[in-house]
Amino acid sequence: MEKYLIVGLGNPGSNYAKTRHNVGFMVINEICNKLNLSLDSSKFNGIFTKTIYNNSIVFFCQPTTYMNLSGEFVIKMLNFYNIPIKNLIVIYDDVDTKLGTIKLRKKGSSGGQNGIKNIINILKTDEIKRIRIGIDKDPHIKLDQYVLSNFKIDELVIIKPAIIKGALATLAAIGEDFDKVMNKFN
């Protein structure tokens, strides 16, 4: 059976739980709720669950380091469980994408997002499948303050369907051709 590492990016702790920067965690939580799983294992500064999905062994994970150190967790999980980079999918927030829009890519730069930037640097490749959840940006608020702020009530109505769609796209990508999944969800 093929193995997959699905990593949602965010910052640990209840004070960050509802922030824009934590939509990757929110997607992992949505998947766990949908599949009746819990993140009940911990290793390498991260929490995860292991399950069988679509004839594949899948690890759904949340690093418990801060966002900009996510790569350490990712490389340790890939190496320890012998998971190929081609079966890594990273889910994270994107300030350059409209709120509530999801975008799937097979490779590319970090776009300034520090979590994926750290993963790219540590893995020494930008050929990493990713699901970006649009959180927009506010020109009146400094970027670091904006991404660490909670969604406003009117934004939750927009972001919740994107989190669900991100979860569905993630599940669709397991054991499937990523190009087909991109065509369906982009």
Swiss-Prot record:
GO molecular function terms attached to this record: peptidyl-tRNA hydrolase activity; tRNA binding
Organism superkingdom: Bacteria
Active site: H21 (proton acceptor)
Feature type site, description Stabilizes the basic form of H active site to accept a proton: D93
Site (Discriminates between blocked and unblocked aminoacyl-tRNA): N11
Enzyme class, spelled out: hydrolase
Enzyme Commission (EC) number: 3.1.1.29
Localization per record: Cytoplasm
Keywords: Cytoplasm, Hydrolase, RNA-binding, tRNA-binding
Family to which the UniProt record says this protein belongs: Belongs to the PTH family.
HAMAP family the UniProt entry points to: Pept_tRNA_hydro_bact
Subunit structure: Monomer.
Protein name in UniProt: Peptidyl-tRNA hydrolase
